[in-house]
Curated annotation (Swiss-Prot):
<dbReference type="InterPro" id="IPR005940">
    <property type="entry name" value="Anthranilate_Pribosyl_Tfrase"/>
</dbReference>
<dbReference type="GO" id="GO:0000287">
    <property type="term" value="F:magnesium ion binding"/>
</dbReference>
<feature type="binding site">
    <location>
        <position position="165"/>
    </location>
    <ligand>
        <name>anthranilate 2</name>
    </ligand>
</feature>
<keyword id="KW-0460">Magnesium</keyword>
<keyword id="KW-0822">Tryptophan biosynthesis</keyword>
<dbReference type="Pfam" id="PF02885">
    <property type="entry name" value="Glycos_trans_3N"/>
</dbReference>
<dbReference type="InterPro" id="IPR017459">
    <property type="entry name" value="Glycosyl_Trfase_fam3_N_dom"/>
</dbReference>
<feature type="binding site">
    <location>
        <position position="91"/>
    </location>
    <ligand>
        <name>Mg(2+) 1</name>
    </ligand>
</feature>
<keyword id="KW-0808">Transferase</keyword>
<comment type="similarity">
    <text>Belongs to the anthranilate phosphoribosyltransferase family.</text>
</comment>
<dbReference type="InterPro" id="IPR036320">
    <property type="entry name" value="Glycosyl_Trfase_fam3_N_dom_sf"/>
</dbReference>
<dbReference type="Pfam" id="PF00591">
    <property type="entry name" value="Glycos_transf_3"/>
</dbReference>
<dbReference type="InterPro" id="IPR000312">
    <property type="entry name" value="Glycosyl_Trfase_fam3"/>
</dbReference>
<feature type="binding site">
    <location>
        <begin position="107"/>
        <end position="115"/>
    </location>
    <ligand>
        <name>5-phospho-alpha-D-ribose 1-diphosphate</name>
    </ligand>
</feature>
<feature type="binding site">
    <location>
        <position position="225"/>
    </location>
    <ligand>
        <name>Mg(2+) 1</name>
    </ligand>
</feature>
<comment type="subunit">
    <text>Homodimer.</text>
</comment>
<feature type="binding site">
    <location>
        <position position="110"/>
    </location>
    <ligand>
        <name>anthranilate 1</name>
    </ligand>
</feature>
Length: 341
């Protein structure tokens, strides 16, 4: 199938959902060569990925991951990355706030690819054991309401793709598949994208996936998160129907002060870990505000509240009551205990 797919792509022809799924199945089963994988990824990038191609690839990659089955539906909040802005770990900080609201969070992430500090890097710097197996992460999610799935542990079949990706050295569809391939089958998702056009594709791809409620967000300043330095664009999907498309949200409308992008910049893992802990401990300022905004959007996705404005108030209450910090401390303690046997 991969040879036929490459032939179609170089002619500018898009693949169907089923064709792209068949190609990914061959790749994940180790039935393709590195040269074929490199040619496929390059041809797909040059043509430009369609929503159906993205969904077909993502559905198989998720199915081939090491799965986690939870007793209740879970939420994931993640930025695709690649915005080049180097903010602190906004989504990761927000994850503890969301968990503090009683939403089960299955955070799926990796080390930094294009930024200085990925979710895995900052969690490790906080003392969390990031390389837990599926059963151990499930215990974290069920017992304390939040767990972290380190992508290399949960996607062993990516070993077939890694050499080709490294050798061709360009951004490929795999750079955007991570947020769509949560091993716990997150039914609720907030996904940040670095470009508007990518938001259009991702929300359309989610229509072909097993998702109950999702928001795709983009800061018009370039952030792959909701921004407080300018307006943000959101796309919303509920029960496989797109109900918002390129809807604009202003921080001022939400009662938040608009600040420069510099105010939410981050650094290396140790610095970002201190920032995360300070925010969850109640520190005020722009970094708290951007976490409140993104946590609020995720709380709306989880159907905890009806509007983002309502979610901001709830997120602030969760932080100020110490519930978010408690989730962080609990995950540090439990992950270390599980890792030590």
């Amino acid at each position: 199938m991969i040879k036929e797919a490459i032939g179609s792509l170089v002619l500018g022809k898009s693949l169907t959902l089923e064709q792209s799924a068949s190609v990914m199945d061959e790749i994940m089963e180790g039935k393709t060569t590195p040269a074929q994988i490199g040619a496929f990824l390059t041809a797909l990038r040059v043509k430009g990925e369609t929503a159906e191609e993205i969904a077909g690839l993502a559905n198989v990659m998720r199915a081939k991951s090491t799965r986690i089955s939870t007793s209740t539906p879970v939420l994931d909040i993640v930025g695709i990355g690649g915005d080049g802005i180097n903010t602190f770990n906004i989504s990761t900080t927000a994850a503890f706030v969301i968990s503090g609201a009683g939403i089960k969070v299955a955070k799926h992430g990796n080390r930094a690819a294009s930024s200085m500090c990925g979710s895995a890097d900052v969690l490790e710097a906080l003392g969390i054991k990031i390389d837990l197996n599926a059963e151990q992460v499930k215990i974290c999610i069920e017992q304390i309401g939040i767990g972290f799935m380190f992508a290399p542990v949960f996607h062993p079949a990516m070993k077939f793709v890694a050499p080709s990706r490294r050798e061709i050295g360009i951004r490929t569809v795999f750079n955007i598949l991570g947020p769509l391939t949560n091993p716990a089958s997150a039914q609720y998702q907030l996904i940040g994208v670095p470009e508007i056009g990518l938001g259009d594709k991702i929300i359309s791809a989610l229509c072909h996936m097993d998702i109950k409620h999702a928001l795709v967000v983009h800061g018009l300043d370039g952030m792959d998160e909701m921004s407080i330095s300018g307006d943000s664009v959101i796309w919303e999907l509920k029960d496989k129907e797109i109900i918002k498309f390129r809807h604009t949200v202003s921080p001022r409308e939400m009662g938040l002060e608009q600040v420069s992008l510099q105010a939410v910049k981050g650094g290396a893992a140790e610095e970002n870990a201190l920032t995360l802990r300070a925010i969850l401990s109640g520190a005020k300022g722009p970094k708290r505000d951007v976490v409140l905004l993104n946590a609020a959007a995720a709380l709306m996705v989880a159907d905890k509240i009806d509007t983002i404005a309502e979610g901001i108030s709830l997120a602030a209450e969760i932080i100020d009551n110490g519930l978010a910090l408690n989730k962080l401390e609990s995950l540090i303690k439990l992950s270390q205990s599980l890792a030590s046997g």
